[in-house]
Each structure stands twice: as C-alpha cells, then as structure tokens.
Amino acid sequence: MGSFSIWHWLIVLLIVVMVFGTKKLKNIGSDLGGAVKGFKDGMKDGASTDDSATTSAPAGQVTNNSTAADKTTIDVEAKHKS
C-alpha cells in the first residue's frame, strides 16, 4: 500500500499523454537528452582544460596576460541618486 502498483503508473502515464500530447512529450525528451549530452561534453572539456591549466601555471602564482580588451577598457565612476 506504500508504493503504487503498475496500474497506477499506467493510469498516470495515460493522463500525462492525454494532457500534453505525444508531440510535446517527444520534444521534452529530446531537449532533456540534448541537455544531458551537453553537460557530459562540458564535463569532458572542463576536465581537459583544468589539467592543462594546472600544468601551465603553478598554484598560487598569478600571471598577468595583457590583451587587447585591457586597452579598450574605460574606467568610470558610478553616481548614486540620493
């Protein structure tokens, strides 16, 4: 009595299909699959870039690499309304 039987789950599935439709459920499934694939690819890329970052600069050492973006940065002051 604590868990649902197979018949309860089939009725819930039937109601969900009737409410959302099969096309919308298919789109949700493909979106979820794409998100999981993107997450896995991101984890693989993150692990490989983390390994290369630790070998290039020792921990605790700060490097200053000036780029073209540093030359175009404008320093401004924010004015607060009172």
From Swiss-Prot:
What cellular component GO annotations does this protein have? Answer: TAT protein transport complex
Q: Where in the cell is it found?
A: Cell inner membrane
In the UniProt record, does the keyword Aminoacyl-tRNA synthetase occur?
no
Q: Which GO biological process entries does UniProt record here? A: protein transport by the Tat complex
Report TM segments: 1-21
**Recorded GO terms, molecular function?**
protein transmembrane transporter activity
Keyword annotations of the record: Cell inner membrane, Cell membrane, Membrane, Protein transport, Translocation, Transmembrane, Transmembrane helix, Transport
Composition bias of kind Polar residues appears in: 49-70
Q: Where is the composition biased (Basic and acidic residues)?
A: 72-82
Q: Chief localization class?
A: membrane
Entries under Pfam families matching the protein? TatA_B_E
The UniProt entry, under Gene3D superfamilies, shows:
1.20.5.3310
Cross-referenced InterPro entries? TatA/B/E, TatA/E
Give membrane topology per the record. Answer: Single-pass membrane protein
Q: Annotated region Disordered: where?
A: 46-82
- Source organism superkingdom: Bacteria
The family note in this entry says: Belongs to the TatA/E family.
What the protein does comes down to: Part of the twin-arginine translocation (Tat) system that transports large folded proteins containing a characteristic twin-arginine motif in their signal peptide across membranes. TatA could form the protein-conducting channel of the Tat system.
Query: Which proteins does it associate with, and in what oligomeric form?
Result: The Tat system comprises two distinct complexes: a TatABC complex, containing multiple copies of TatA, TatB and TatC subunits, and a separate TatA complex, containing only TatA subunits. Substrates initially bind to the TatABC complex, which probably triggers association of the separate TatA complex to form the active translocon.
Task: Report the protein name in the record.
Answer: Sec-independent protein translocase protein TatA
